[in-house]
Protein backbone atom coordinates (compact mmCIF):
# COMPACT_ATOMS: atom_id res chain seq x y z
CA UNK A 1 0.00 0.00 0.00
CA UNK A 2 1.62 3.30 -1.09
CA UNK A 3 2.57 5.80 1.58
CA UNK A 4 0.78 9.10 1.02
CA UNK A 5 1.74 11.16 4.03
CA UNK A 6 5.51 10.80 4.52
CA UNK A 7 8.20 13.23 3.39
CA UNK A 8 11.86 13.97 4.09
CA UNK A 9 12.62 17.55 5.09
CA UNK A 10 16.22 17.32 6.25
CA UNK A 11 19.31 15.13 6.21
CA UNK A 12 22.37 15.05 8.45
CA UNK A 13 25.04 12.84 6.89
CA UNK A 14 28.46 12.45 8.51
CA UNK A 15 31.46 10.52 7.24
CA UNK A 16 34.78 10.77 5.46
CA UNK A 17 33.35 13.71 3.48
CA UNK A 18 32.68 15.73 6.64
CA UNK A 19 29.34 16.73 8.17
CA UNK A 20 26.15 17.92 6.55
CA UNK A 21 24.16 17.78 3.33
CA UNK A 22 26.48 20.17 1.48
CA UNK A 23 29.55 18.11 2.38
CA UNK A 24 27.98 14.89 1.08
CA UNK A 25 26.69 16.65 -2.04
CA UNK A 26 30.19 17.93 -2.87
CA UNK A 27 31.69 14.47 -2.38
CA UNK A 28 29.06 12.90 -4.64
CA UNK A 29 29.74 15.47 -7.35
CA UNK A 30 33.48 14.84 -7.17
CA UNK A 31 32.79 11.08 -7.12
CA UNK A 32 36.24 10.16 -5.83
CA UNK A 33 36.95 7.48 -3.21
CA UNK A 34 37.88 9.03 0.13
CA UNK A 35 39.68 6.01 1.57
CA UNK A 36 43.11 6.79 2.98
CA UNK A 37 45.64 4.86 5.06
CA UNK A 38 44.14 4.79 8.55
CA UNK A 39 45.54 7.35 10.98
CA UNK A 40 44.02 5.54 13.96
CA UNK A 41 45.11 2.13 15.23
CA UNK A 42 47.82 1.50 12.66
CA UNK A 43 49.97 -1.60 12.35
CA UNK A 44 47.26 -4.20 12.91
CA UNK A 45 48.55 -6.46 10.14
CA UNK A 46 45.22 -6.50 8.29
CA UNK A 47 44.43 -7.22 4.65
CA UNK A 48 44.33 -3.47 4.04
CA UNK A 49 45.06 -0.38 6.10
CA UNK A 50 42.62 1.75 4.12
CA UNK A 51 39.76 3.43 5.98
CA UNK A 52 37.21 6.19 5.49
CA UNK A 53 37.65 8.26 8.65
CA UNK A 54 35.59 11.26 9.71
CA UNK A 55 37.90 14.30 9.44
CA UNK A 56 38.90 15.53 12.89
CA UNK A 57 37.62 19.04 12.16
CA UNK A 58 34.13 17.91 11.09
CA UNK A 59 32.59 18.57 14.50
CA UNK A 60 33.30 18.86 18.20
CA UNK A 61 30.99 16.87 20.42
CA UNK A 62 30.71 19.76 22.90
CA UNK A 63 29.18 21.89 20.14
CA UNK A 64 26.26 19.50 19.57
CA UNK A 65 25.53 18.69 23.21
CA UNK A 66 24.01 21.25 25.62
CA UNK A 67 25.95 22.21 28.71
CA UNK A 68 23.45 20.35 30.89
CA UNK A 69 24.32 17.06 29.16
CA UNK A 70 28.09 17.41 28.80
CA UNK A 71 28.87 15.24 31.82
CA UNK A 72 27.56 12.35 29.74
CA UNK A 73 30.29 12.83 27.11
CA UNK A 74 32.55 10.58 29.18
CA UNK A 75 30.22 7.65 28.44
CA UNK A 76 29.92 8.33 24.71
CA UNK A 77 31.65 6.08 22.19
CA UNK A 78 32.25 7.31 18.60
CA UNK A 79 28.96 5.77 17.45
CA UNK A 80 27.05 7.94 19.92
CA UNK A 81 29.04 11.08 19.11
CA UNK A 82 28.48 10.76 15.37
CA UNK A 83 24.76 10.09 15.94
CA UNK A 84 24.47 13.32 17.91
CA UNK A 85 26.37 15.28 15.26
CA UNK A 86 24.23 13.84 12.46
CA UNK A 87 21.02 14.57 14.36
CA UNK A 88 22.00 18.18 15.07
CA UNK A 89 22.85 18.68 11.39
CA UNK A 90 19.58 17.11 10.21
CA UNK A 91 17.43 19.18 12.58
CA UNK A 92 19.06 22.41 11.42
CA UNK A 93 18.79 21.35 7.77
CA UNK A 94 15.05 20.79 8.21
CA UNK A 95 14.59 24.03 10.18
CA UNK A 96 13.04 22.20 13.11
CA UNK A 97 13.39 23.52 16.64
CA UNK A 98 14.29 21.43 19.68
CA UNK A 99 15.15 22.21 23.27
CA UNK A 100 18.84 22.11 22.30
CA UNK A 101 18.97 23.83 18.91
CA UNK A 102 16.56 26.61 19.97
CA UNK A 103 16.45 26.59 23.80
CA UNK A 104 14.59 29.91 24.04
CA UNK A 105 11.84 29.02 21.56
CA UNK A 106 8.86 26.69 21.45
CA UNK A 107 9.93 23.31 20.04
CA UNK A 108 8.67 22.30 16.59
CA UNK A 109 7.26 19.68 16.52
CA UNK A 110 5.71 19.09 19.94
CA UNK A 111 8.25 16.90 21.82
CA UNK A 112 5.51 14.33 22.45
CA UNK A 113 5.11 14.05 18.66
CA UNK A 114 8.82 13.75 17.83
CA UNK A 115 9.96 10.14 17.45
CA UNK A 116 13.39 8.57 17.09
CA UNK A 117 14.33 5.42 15.18
CA UNK A 118 18.04 4.64 14.86
CA UNK A 119 20.05 1.73 13.55
CA UNK A 120 23.00 0.58 15.66
CA UNK A 121 25.73 -1.99 15.31
CA UNK A 122 27.61 -4.33 17.60
CA UNK A 123 29.51 -1.52 19.31
CA UNK A 124 33.07 -2.55 20.13
CA UNK A 125 34.49 -1.74 23.56
CA UNK A 126 37.50 0.54 23.93
CA UNK A 127 40.68 -1.53 23.66
CA UNK A 128 42.59 0.43 26.30
CA UNK A 129 39.64 0.34 28.67
CA UNK A 130 39.44 -3.44 28.45
CA UNK A 131 43.20 -3.95 28.35
CA UNK A 132 43.74 -3.99 32.11
CA UNK A 133 40.90 -6.41 32.68
CA UNK A 134 42.09 -8.73 29.91
CA UNK A 135 45.65 -8.74 31.25
CA UNK A 136 44.43 -9.94 34.64
CA UNK A 137 42.08 -12.51 33.09
CA UNK A 138 44.69 -13.96 30.69
CA UNK A 139 47.99 -14.24 32.60
CA UNK A 140 49.16 -17.10 30.34
CA UNK A 141 47.74 -15.64 27.14
CA UNK A 142 44.49 -17.58 27.39
CA UNK A 143 41.40 -16.04 28.98
CA UNK A 144 40.40 -17.65 32.26
CA UNK A 145 36.68 -16.99 32.62
CA UNK A 146 36.90 -17.43 36.39
CA UNK A 147 39.59 -14.76 36.65
CA UNK A 148 37.64 -12.56 34.24
CA UNK A 149 34.53 -12.65 36.39
CA UNK A 150 36.32 -12.47 39.73
CA UNK A 151 39.17 -10.00 39.11
CA UNK A 152 39.00 -8.75 35.54
CA UNK A 153 35.63 -7.05 35.89
CA UNK A 154 36.91 -5.14 38.91
CA UNK A 155 39.31 -3.30 36.58
CA UNK A 156 36.42 -1.79 34.61
CA UNK A 157 34.82 1.53 35.49
CA UNK A 158 31.24 1.20 36.85
CA UNK A 159 29.70 2.94 33.83
CA UNK A 160 31.74 1.22 31.13
CA UNK A 161 28.82 -0.63 29.54
CA UNK A 162 26.83 2.58 29.00
CA UNK A 163 29.15 3.34 26.08
CA UNK A 164 28.41 0.14 24.24
CA UNK A 165 24.72 -0.76 24.53
CA UNK A 166 23.15 -0.53 21.03
CA UNK A 167 20.24 1.59 22.25
CA UNK A 168 22.50 4.28 23.74
CA UNK A 169 22.77 6.42 20.56
CA UNK A 170 18.98 6.77 20.54
CA UNK A 171 18.97 7.37 24.31
CA UNK A 172 21.37 10.31 24.05
CA UNK A 173 19.68 11.73 20.95
CA UNK A 174 16.21 11.69 22.52
CA UNK A 175 17.45 13.19 25.79
CA UNK A 176 19.46 15.94 24.11
CA UNK A 177 16.63 16.96 21.77
CA UNK A 178 13.68 16.24 24.05
CA UNK A 179 12.12 13.69 21.67
CA UNK A 180 9.35 11.96 23.62
CA UNK A 181 7.54 10.20 20.78
CA UNK A 182 7.85 6.56 19.65
CA UNK A 183 11.44 5.29 19.73
CA UNK A 184 13.13 2.13 18.52
CA UNK A 185 16.62 0.79 17.81
CA UNK A 186 17.32 -1.47 14.82
CA UNK A 187 20.21 -3.92 15.16
CA UNK A 188 20.25 -5.38 11.66
CA UNK A 189 23.77 -4.69 10.41
CA UNK A 190 24.16 -2.42 7.39
CA UNK A 191 20.40 -2.35 6.84
CA UNK A 192 19.62 -1.02 10.32
CA UNK A 193 19.52 2.68 9.50
CA UNK A 194 17.42 2.23 6.35
CA UNK A 195 15.03 -0.02 8.27
CA UNK A 196 14.87 2.79 10.83
CA UNK A 197 13.63 5.10 8.07
CA UNK A 198 10.97 2.55 7.09
CA UNK A 199 9.93 2.27 10.74
CA UNK A 200 9.67 6.06 11.00
CA UNK A 201 7.52 6.13 7.87
CA UNK A 202 5.08 3.63 9.38
CA UNK A 203 4.98 5.50 12.71
CA UNK A 204 4.07 8.70 10.87
CA UNK A 205 1.64 7.01 8.48
CA UNK A 206 -0.37 5.59 11.38
CA UNK A 207 -0.48 9.01 13.07
CA UNK A 208 1.71 8.35 16.11
CA UNK A 209 4.22 11.15 15.38
CA UNK A 210 4.51 14.34 13.35
CA UNK A 211 8.23 13.89 12.71
CA UNK A 212 10.95 11.34 13.44
CA UNK A 213 14.73 11.40 13.73
CA UNK A 214 15.56 8.35 11.62
CA UNK A 215 18.84 6.81 10.52
CA UNK A 216 21.92 5.52 12.29
CA UNK A 217 25.70 5.60 12.60
CA UNK A 218 28.53 3.20 13.36
CA UNK A 219 32.31 3.19 13.80
CA UNK A 220 33.69 0.42 11.60
CA UNK A 221 37.32 1.63 11.79
CA UNK A 222 37.62 0.59 15.44
CA UNK A 223 40.45 -1.99 15.67
CA UNK A 224 38.10 -4.72 16.89
CA UNK A 225 35.64 -3.96 14.09
CA UNK A 226 38.39 -4.00 11.48
CA UNK A 227 39.77 -7.25 12.87
CA UNK A 228 36.29 -8.81 12.61
CA UNK A 229 36.14 -7.82 8.94
CA UNK A 230 39.69 -9.08 8.37
CA UNK A 231 39.04 -12.49 9.92
CA UNK A 232 35.89 -12.94 7.85
CA UNK A 233 37.80 -11.90 4.69
CA UNK A 234 35.66 -8.82 4.05
CA UNK A 235 38.38 -6.14 3.99
CA UNK A 236 39.63 -4.78 0.67
CA UNK A 237 39.72 -1.78 -1.63
CA UNK A 238 35.96 -1.30 -1.89
CA UNK A 239 35.49 -1.59 -5.67
CA UNK A 240 31.74 -2.03 -6.39
CA UNK A 241 30.76 -5.29 -8.12
CA UNK A 242 34.37 -6.61 -7.99
CA UNK A 243 34.25 -8.73 -4.79
CA UNK A 244 37.63 -7.45 -3.58
CA UNK A 245 36.51 -6.60 -0.06
CA UNK A 246 35.10 -3.43 1.52
CA UNK A 247 36.83 -0.39 2.98
CA UNK A 248 35.66 0.21 6.57
CA UNK A 249 34.24 3.62 7.37
CA UNK A 250 32.77 5.57 10.26
CA UNK A 251 29.65 7.68 10.25
CA UNK A 252 26.13 7.47 8.91
CA UNK A 253 23.19 9.83 8.71
CA UNK A 254 19.98 10.96 10.35
CA UNK A 255 17.00 11.96 8.21
CA UNK A 256 14.07 14.09 9.28
CA UNK A 257 11.05 12.02 8.26
CA UNK A 258 7.89 14.08 8.63
CA UNK A 259 4.19 13.97 7.90
CA UNK A 260 3.16 15.94 4.83
CA UNK A 261 0.57 17.89 6.83
CA UNK A 262 3.07 18.95 9.48
CA UNK A 263 5.72 19.89 6.93
CA UNK A 264 3.22 21.91 4.91
CA UNK A 265 1.85 23.67 7.99
CA UNK A 266 5.30 24.98 8.90
CA UNK A 267 6.17 25.80 5.26
CA UNK A 268 9.07 23.36 5.23
CA UNK A 269 11.07 22.55 2.12
CA UNK A 270 10.15 19.03 1.07
CA UNK A 271 13.26 17.28 -0.22
CA UNK A 272 11.57 14.01 -1.20
CA UNK A 273 8.52 11.86 -0.60
CA UNK A 274 8.77 8.35 0.83
CA UNK A 275 6.32 6.26 -1.18
CA UNK A 276 7.53 2.66 -0.94
CA UNK A 277 9.32 0.55 1.67
CA UNK A 278 10.32 -3.09 2.03
CA UNK A 279 12.63 -5.38 3.99
CA UNK A 280 13.71 -8.99 3.80
CA UNK A 281 16.26 -11.67 4.62
CA UNK A 282 18.39 -13.98 2.51
CA UNK A 283 18.27 -17.64 3.64
CA UNK A 284 21.63 -18.34 1.99
CA UNK A 285 24.09 -15.92 3.64
CA UNK A 286 27.46 -17.45 4.61
CA UNK A 287 30.15 -16.45 7.11
CA UNK A 288 31.85 -14.12 4.64
CA UNK A 289 28.58 -12.50 3.59
CA UNK A 290 28.42 -14.55 0.43
CA UNK A 291 25.15 -15.40 -1.29
CA UNK A 292 24.30 -17.06 -4.62
CA UNK A 293 24.27 -14.63 -7.53
CA UNK A 294 20.64 -15.49 -8.24
CA UNK A 295 19.46 -15.28 -4.62
CA UNK A 296 15.76 -14.35 -5.09
CA UNK A 297 15.51 -12.37 -1.85
CA UNK A 298 17.33 -9.36 -3.39
CA UNK A 299 14.90 -8.96 -6.27
CA UNK A 300 11.96 -9.72 -3.99
CA UNK A 301 12.71 -6.79 -1.68
CA UNK A 302 13.31 -4.38 -4.57
CA UNK A 303 10.10 -5.46 -6.29
CA UNK A 304 8.04 -5.16 -3.11
CA UNK A 305 9.31 -1.61 -2.49
CA UNK A 306 8.39 -0.65 -6.06
CA UNK A 307 4.98 -2.31 -5.70
CA UNK A 308 4.47 -0.59 -2.34
CA UNK A 309 5.04 2.74 -4.08
CA UNK A 310 2.29 1.92 -6.56
CA UNK A 311 4.58 2.22 -9.59
CA UNK A 312 6.32 -0.12 -12.03
CA UNK A 313 10.01 -0.85 -12.58
CA UNK A 314 9.93 1.33 -15.71
CA UNK A 315 9.13 4.34 -13.52
CA UNK A 316 12.46 4.12 -11.64
CA UNK A 317 15.01 6.71 -12.81
CA UNK A 318 17.97 5.70 -10.68
CA UNK A 319 19.09 3.01 -8.24
CA UNK A 320 21.31 3.85 -5.27
CA UNK A 321 22.85 0.64 -3.97
CA UNK A 322 25.12 -0.35 -1.11
CA UNK A 323 27.59 -2.22 -3.36
CA UNK A 324 30.99 -1.89 -1.68
CA UNK A 325 33.19 -4.64 -3.08
CA UNK A 326 31.79 -7.65 -1.23
CA UNK A 327 30.38 -10.96 -2.42
CA UNK A 328 26.74 -9.90 -2.18
CA UNK A 329 27.33 -7.13 -4.76
CA UNK A 330 26.88 -9.71 -7.51
CA UNK A 331 23.43 -10.62 -6.21
CA UNK A 332 22.51 -6.91 -6.00
CA UNK A 333 23.52 -6.41 -9.62
CA UNK A 334 21.74 -9.58 -10.75
CA UNK A 335 18.53 -8.36 -9.08
CA UNK A 336 18.81 -4.91 -10.70
CA UNK A 337 19.42 -6.50 -14.10
CA UNK A 338 16.48 -8.89 -13.73
CA UNK A 339 14.05 -6.16 -12.67
CA UNK A 340 15.26 -3.14 -14.66
CA UNK A 341 17.51 -4.65 -17.33
CA UNK A 342 20.45 -2.43 -16.35
CA UNK A 343 24.07 -3.61 -16.46
CA UNK A 344 26.60 -2.87 -13.71
CA UNK A 345 28.05 -0.07 -15.87
CA UNK A 346 24.70 1.67 -16.37
CA UNK A 347 25.05 5.34 -15.30
CA UNK A 348 21.66 5.11 -13.62
CA UNK A 349 23.21 2.91 -10.91
CA UNK A 350 25.00 4.88 -8.19
CA UNK A 351 27.35 3.18 -5.71
CA UNK A 352 28.27 5.85 -3.14
CA UNK A 353 29.91 3.46 -0.64
CA UNK A 354 33.21 4.05 -2.44
CA UNK A 355 33.04 7.59 -1.05
CA UNK A 356 32.31 6.88 2.61
CA UNK A 357 33.17 3.18 3.00
CA UNK A 358 31.12 0.57 4.79
CA UNK A 359 29.85 2.39 7.86
CA UNK A 360 27.96 -0.62 9.16
CA UNK A 361 24.66 0.45 10.67
CA UNK A 362 25.15 3.91 9.13
CA UNK A 363 25.40 2.64 5.55
CA UNK A 364 21.68 2.43 4.81
CA UNK A 365 21.02 6.00 5.96
CA UNK A 366 23.89 7.28 3.80
CA UNK A 367 22.44 5.47 0.79
CA UNK A 368 19.03 7.00 1.59
CA UNK A 369 20.57 10.46 2.01
CA UNK A 370 22.23 10.11 -1.38
CA UNK A 371 18.83 9.32 -2.90
CA UNK A 372 17.28 12.35 -1.21
CA UNK A 373 20.00 14.60 -2.64
CA UNK A 374 19.51 13.22 -6.16
CA UNK A 375 15.82 14.04 -5.99
CA UNK A 376 16.07 17.40 -4.24
CA UNK A 377 18.70 18.58 -6.74
CA UNK A 378 16.51 17.60 -9.70
CA UNK A 379 18.75 14.77 -10.92
CA UNK A 380 15.99 12.16 -10.67
CA UNK A 381 12.24 12.05 -10.14
CA UNK A 382 11.96 8.59 -8.61
CA UNK A 383 14.80 6.63 -6.97
CA UNK A 384 15.08 3.10 -5.60
CA UNK A 385 17.50 2.97 -2.64
CA UNK A 386 18.69 -0.49 -1.64
CA UNK A 387 21.04 -1.83 1.01
CA UNK A 388 22.05 -5.35 1.99
CA UNK A 389 23.77 -6.37 5.21
CA UNK A 390 26.57 -8.85 5.80
CA UNK A 391 24.07 -10.99 7.69
CA UNK A 392 21.84 -11.26 4.62
CA UNK A 393 19.32 -8.57 5.64
CA UNK A 394 17.87 -6.27 2.97
CA UNK A 395 16.01 -2.95 2.99
CA UNK A 396 14.65 -0.80 0.18
CA UNK A 397 13.03 2.60 -0.21
CA UNK A 398 11.33 4.29 -3.12
CA UNK A 399 11.71 8.06 -2.90
CA UNK A 400 10.00 10.52 -5.24
CA UNK A 401 10.11 14.22 -6.00
CA UNK A 402 7.43 16.31 -4.33
CA UNK A 403 4.50 17.03 -6.62
Spans of features found by a protein language model:
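Short beta-strand segments
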Residues: 115-119, 187, 212-218, 257, ...
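Condensing-enzyme catalytic core mediating Claisen C-C bond formation in acyl metabolism
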Residues: 5-9, 33-37, 235-311, 317-318, ...
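Conserved beta-ketoacyl condensing-enzyme motif
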Residues: 8, 29-177, 220, 313-340
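ACP-dependent fatty acid/polyketide chain-elongation machinery
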Residues: 1-73, 94, 261-275, 369-377, ...
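Cysteine-centered functional microenvironments
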Residues: 11-12, 66-76, 102-105, 149-160, ...
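Active-site-proximal alpha-helical scaffold in enzymes
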Residues: 83-95, 166-169, 174-179, 183-215, ...
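Active-site-adjacent elements of ketosynthase-type condensing enzymes
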Residues: 47-56, 219-240, 254, 279-300, ...
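Glycine-/small-residue-rich "gating" segment that lines the acyl/pantetheine channel
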Residues: 138-156, 198, 202-205, 218-265, ...
Amino acid sequence: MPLHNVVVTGIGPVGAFGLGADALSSALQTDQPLAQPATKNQGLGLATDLACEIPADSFKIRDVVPKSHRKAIKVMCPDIESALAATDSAIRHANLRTTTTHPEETPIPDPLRLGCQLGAGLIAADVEELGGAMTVAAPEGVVDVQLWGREGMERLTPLWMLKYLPNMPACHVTIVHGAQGPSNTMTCGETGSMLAVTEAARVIERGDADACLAGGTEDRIHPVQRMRQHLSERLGKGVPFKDTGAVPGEGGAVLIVESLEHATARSATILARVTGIAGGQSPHCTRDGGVPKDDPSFASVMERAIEDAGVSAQDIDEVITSASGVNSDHAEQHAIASILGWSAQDPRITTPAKIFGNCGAGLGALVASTAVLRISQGQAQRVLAFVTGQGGQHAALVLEASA
